[in-house]
């Protein structure tokens, strides 16, 4: 698994599934380049830890790095899709439980125009 690929798709999914105060999705206006450095570093740290802690289950799942990043964001934040609904059985359940350990993250636009979470 390539951390940077997982992280990239995690960030894309985060922007896609998060909204501004007016309800517009963040990805309609912002890209991963707009994520504040400290928020991106936190995302990187969470993704790296998740990959390391769940390497065996992730390998067995057969999911691509892109899917892992996407599903990690959706699952940890309790969205209506994620590891649990891919038909992975016990592996999906284990990855879902592991994702929940990281808690939810809420993104917002700071006064400086960067995305924080």
Task: Give the predicted meaning of each segment.
Residues 1-63:
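Long, contiguous N-terminal structural blocks used for assembly/anchoring
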Residues 45-113:
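Amphipathic protein-protein interaction modules
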């Amino acid at each position: 698994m390539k951390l940077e690929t997982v992280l990239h798709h995690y960030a894309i999914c985060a922007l896609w599934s998060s909204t501004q105060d007016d309800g517009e999705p963040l990805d309609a206006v912002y890209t991963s380049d707009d994520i504040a450095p400290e928020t991106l570093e936190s995302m990187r740290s969470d993704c790296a830890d998740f990959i390391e802690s769940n390497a065996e289950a992730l390998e067995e799942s057969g999911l691509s790095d892109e899917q892992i990043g996407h599903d990690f964001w959706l699952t940890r934040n309790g969205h209506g899709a994620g590891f649990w609904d891919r038909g992975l059985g016990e592996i999906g359940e284990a990855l879902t439980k592991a994702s929940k350990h990281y808690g939810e993250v809420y993104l917002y636009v700071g006064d400086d125009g960067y995305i924080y979470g």
